[in-house]
């Protein structure tokens, strides 16, 4: 039987060989953390390589995602669908082993990591999901939700601001089943970290309310095992295991230096490392007895089978809850949602109201909340402004089975935590802040889109229309930056009806996040036929029209739709054949078939005016170089909103004048 050290050395060998073959990558972290990974994965981790999506598996997150060969080695050795050929194709086009781990590409990878600090944030989200789901579904004698979230993190994660945001919240929420391993090797890309990172990390985490285990020898299996047992015994606090490790462990000339961090060791050094580790096998060769000891297929299947029996007993005792749990873990919509949502939208159209779209959003949450027990909402300390609370909201810090998170002023942390909640399954998270502060959350927003995760992002106070707070709080370029993010769906509704349609779209969307861009100020409701009402979901539609072919088309979104309608009415009265297109979602519109797009924006009509209180440049793709744009080209100013709209040209007279220049 191979020793624990030999089992860990299998990870080291695969990691240095794959990085060498790829001619790029990060061998240092996998080599340094191999002993920790061996103990966690072989002695503690509850998982089934034959079913990577088993609901009650433990979640493992590699927050220091550059060390991706660590997780690929573990998945390969324990029996996941990751053959040796894929390890040989590390970092190559269309392989299952991309440079940083990507969820959806590789069976067993729980989240996409690489931007440092976001993995631990996702892990906090997963731990919140586990704790909340357990409170919602477990019953006396039936613990069907009972698993841990384990995260590996390095010095880079610790330095990133997001780790401060999310680890602080994790302590406050007492996430006892979150266990993080700190790879304390003292090295980052620039060299030894003493020059730029001298925090007392243990005291920092104790101040957050974590259980901290100091001075673990990260290369001694017995010490690591004792620490994990201690952490699992602490149920009311997350645990940080501070593991002293040597980066590039086993490399005679590069261990303990930044040379092993982000580059292949080189053939000569790899040969010396094999010698030092006593690893007698050729590159990519693993002896059968080491495979046999690593193989987790049988044990994993046994664990899942035992859980299946538990779940069958639960289903017998609580059939309704079991059916609901299954539906939610599959991410399926309730069967009656579509019909009830359409009924709500039709009722709104029949009962006009002049309200802010942020208020319309709250009304939609109020209507959809009772239909969607999977909602897990939250705001970055702006609930009274974002209007994200509804009558059924219960904060999880007050009621463990609740459905609302007070994130505090942590926009980046909030968004990345919500990604983790979404990845875990069983919930549909929505988050909120002022649109301006999407800037703080930006990379987690991008990661949601990249990972195709469901999340409804509620962004209010969407333009100069917020008024007196001034340019620090007035978004200009933010909507455009969301629109150009691949796989992000962005909606800027013009009234309560479009707001509800946008919410329905975001809730039903299965393959990515949806951003709702909402006003502070009240917006007039537009009249619509049944056909126009149905066409809102297509992203853009004809709201006002003329007989026959128009000479001129206005395209507008959000608060500027009523301005475009007023300009249209003025020109129509003067005998101009004009049309107004409301375009709440450019991405939804762009997905429509060519015939529909042509029916809304005929190519023959080149006189087009886009009106939006956001950055002007975005609209050239719709108005062409011969069109006109009434938009923002500078930052805003501090003044009452109505004066600002006048100052920046958002008036009927100016819009009409721009239109006439094209005729």
Curated annotation (Swiss-Prot):
Q: Where does substrate bind?
A: 26, 261, 358, 385, 461, 469, 473, 520
**Annotated site (Important for catalytic activity):** 26, 261
Keywords, comma-separated and alphabetical: Acetylation, Calcium, Magnesium, Metal-binding, Thiamine pyrophosphate, Transferase
Cellular component GO terms held in the UniProt record: cytosol
Q: Name one GO biological process term.
A: pentose-phosphate shunt
Question: This protein's superkingdom?
Answer: Bacteria
As recorded in UniProt, its EC number(s) are 2.2.1.1
Q: Which residues carry this modification: N6-acetyllysine?
A: 46
Instruction: Write out the GO MF terms.
Output: magnesium ion binding; manganese ion binding; protein homodimerization activity; thiamine pyrophosphate binding; transketolase activity
Q: Which reaction does it catalyse?
A: D-sedoheptulose 7-phosphate + D-glyceraldehyde 3-phosphate = aldehydo-D-ribose 5-phosphate + D-xylulose 5-phosphate
Q: How is the cofactor bound?
A: Binds 1 Mg(2+) ion per subunit. Can also utilize other divalent metal cations, such as Ca(2+), Mn(2+) and Co(2+).
> SUPFAM superfamilies from the xrefs?
Thiamin diphosphate-binding fold (THDP-binding), TK C-terminal domain-like
Residues annotated as the enzyme's active site: 411 (proton donor)
Chloroplast as a keyword of this entry, yes or no, is no
Cite the binding residues for thiamine diphosphate: 66, 114-116, 156, 185, 261, 437
**Similarity field:** Belongs to the transketolase family.
Q: What does this protein do?
A: Catalyzes the transfer of a two-carbon ketol group from a ketose donor to an aldose acceptor, via a covalent intermediate with the cofactor thiamine pyrophosphate. Thus, catalyzes the reversible transfer of a two-carbon ketol group from sedoheptulose-7-phosphate to glyceraldehyde-3-phosphate, producing xylulose-5-phosphate and ribose-5-phosphate.
Protein known as: Transketolase 1
Upper lineage is:
Bacteria, Pseudomonadati, Pseudomonadota, Gammaproteobacteria, Enterobacterales
The gene from which this protein is expressed is tktA
